Structures are given as C-alpha cells and as structure tokens.
C-alpha cells in the first residue's frame, strides 16, 4: 500500500491486538519509515509506554485526545494507536492523518463487555483500507472467543483492567454465565 491509509485491528480483549500493532510498527521501522505510537494515558496498568498483556513494552506518546499530539507527530509517516476505542477524536484524527499521506494503524476493541459497539470504531471501519478482526481463546471452554466479559458488576464502559477484571469468551460461554 502506497500513500496514506488506515489499518484497523479489532477484536476482544486478549486477542493480540496490541501485539499485532507493535509487530506492524516494527516492520515499518525495519523498512526505514519514521514511526510513532500513541496510547491512551488513562491506561496505566503496567507503567509508561504501550504494553501487551504478556508484558512486552513499546515506547509511546500518552494522551487522552489525539488532537493533542498533532504538532508532535508531523515528522512521522507511520502512526500506531493502541486502545483506539477510548479516543473521542479517533475518526477525525485518522481520516486527517491518512489524507495527509500517513499510514495509521489502530488497535481497538470492537465491542464493550455488554457486546455493544464502540461507535467511534464502528465509524472508522468504512474509512479504513484494511480491517482485521482477531479472536482470542475462550477462558472457560478454550474455543475461539470473540467477546470480552467483565468479571465484576460495574456498569461503566471505561474501566481499564486485565485478566483480573475481564475474560475473553465464546458466544456460548458469554450467554451461559
């Protein structure tokens, strides 16, 4: 793919979205592209930078709104964004960056723990040149898992946690529990 475009990596928790994002950014680095990654600053589960659930770390700018980094990223040609569902301006930002010739790679949940869409990610799909939906392993029956299930009783959408608060589950296990 030449020129600006958007790559969207979606799926449930524990499906390897952040790992795939890092893999793609590293490939562009090997190909001599100037790359930057951005993560949601309220996600501080493991420390600074972008972290995978298996504790791999990658340097990243940390913000709550993508428009806050517009000046800092002008010299970069590849922009990786983790936890895209939490950025309120993800659609406008990605469209602007791709239109300016930048490669934008977004990793995001496609649905909430209630299996409802993150509308900003849903709105990004028709603007993306590439969309990949990953699956995880069901933490109950070990089959393919397409959903994230919260273990607690909280009802707020934005509660950031790992396997202490969420499980990846298949359709049957989601419904049965």
Swiss-Prot record:
Recall the GO molecular function terms of this protein's record: ATP binding; metal ion binding; thymidine kinase activity
Task: Note the Pfam families from the entry.
Answer: TK (PF00265)
Q: What class of enzyme is it?
A: transferase
Q: Where does ATP bind?
A: 11-18
Signal sequence residues: none
Coiled coil residues, start to end: none
Q: What is this protein called?
A: Thymidine kinase
Native species: Monkeypox virus
Top-level taxonomy: Viruses, Varidnaviria, Bamfordvirae, Nucleocytoviricota, Pokkesviricetes
User: What's the gene?
Assistant: OPG101
